[in-house]
Amino acid sequence: PIVRELTTEQESSVYKKMEQIRTGMGAEVSRLKPEDATDICVETVEEGGESDERRERMRRDEVVLVLDYPDRKNCFQDVKIYARAGESVTVWTVVRSKKDAEGKAVLRTLLQAEENAKIRLVQVDLLGDRMQLFNDIGVESGKQAQIEVVQLFLGAEKIWAGSYATLTGEKSHLQLDVGYYREKQQLLDMNYVAQHIGKKTESNMNVGGVLQDASKKVFRGTIDFPLGCVGAKGDEMEDVLILGEDAINQTVPLILCAEDDVEGNHGASIGRPADEVLFYLASRGLSEEDACNLLARAKLEALCNRIGEQKIAEQAENWLWEVTGDET
């Protein structure tokens, strides 16, 4: 793919059109964007007639974006990912700051995949625990397009996350996997929507994580089947491990259905570790705190293994070990 940094005035018609893609946090987020903002635009390129440099860049189907947010500043970043018909691209986005930094980090990511295109987006949050993160995603898919989104929320004091996937093209597919670790009085508030417009479209949303101490998590997951999306299928699964006595978990699943020939499913596994599991780990010499930390790591390391980029995966795993303490 080609990576460009464009001001609003320099954007092509494709990127300007992408501004109309609906996102999970709504139009209010776009109002936070400064007029002189610089967008990061990732696009696949057409074959034929390119320069040697352009052909060489075409061989790269992976892009790593590391966004460092400064202390005591509020920053907005737009990332736009465009995959032409039949092309594929993987983008890793790491948001990070110094441990003691404070401020607001706003990240909006817009994805558009044309017919038979594939986009894989991996987002890893490594912000300091005094930061606030607004993470917004909008997706639009063409016929038989495939979208995969992997998110891992480990840092920041408060996180508001939204995603809205408009599955327009017939047989297009969305795979969304979210993992999180919340401790102390940290907050994670999520609003995720999969709207099935095209026939035989599919969506899978899997959200799972750990709540320690007095942390709070809210998950609103919506699968929308409007009239005409014949044969569409949407699945939504949540898996929450509650380790804190004062932790608060709120789950608000919603399936909207105006079409008869569709299939929508919601499942949830929410609760504390079973006594027999804690007893077994205690028999192996682990205290209850160490046992809970072990379970927390095990839950999220599986998602770390799916990051697919070694350095980023190592950073996420090191962060996870730091917040859960050393294994004994």
Where are these regions (language model features)?
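Extended amphipathic alpha-helical segments enriched in small hydrophobics
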Residues: 280-302
